[in-house]
């Protein structure tokens, strides 16, 4: 079992964020000690790595929770949906970059 400090050091996720994930039910510690310390097993750390992956894809925490709480969730479908959203965002950003370039040429 790993303490919240250990998990924080391993993953780079702050202790505050780990506590927040616990508060919102996204990542519950495997065990609480009598003193109230959070302990995590390897399975919980693996789940945290999945959460980190989804966050890297800019998936909101509420959606990550829905995905992970659904026993029948389709990881591939979730990734396809996020890919589509990121492509739309990229297209918007490309449009903004083109606009800025045009404005700069006019200066």
Q: Over which residues does each language-model region extend?
A:
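Basic helix-turn-helix/winged-helix DNA-binding cores
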Residues: 1-66
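Short, charged amphipathic alpha-helical surface segments
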Residues: 52, 65-107
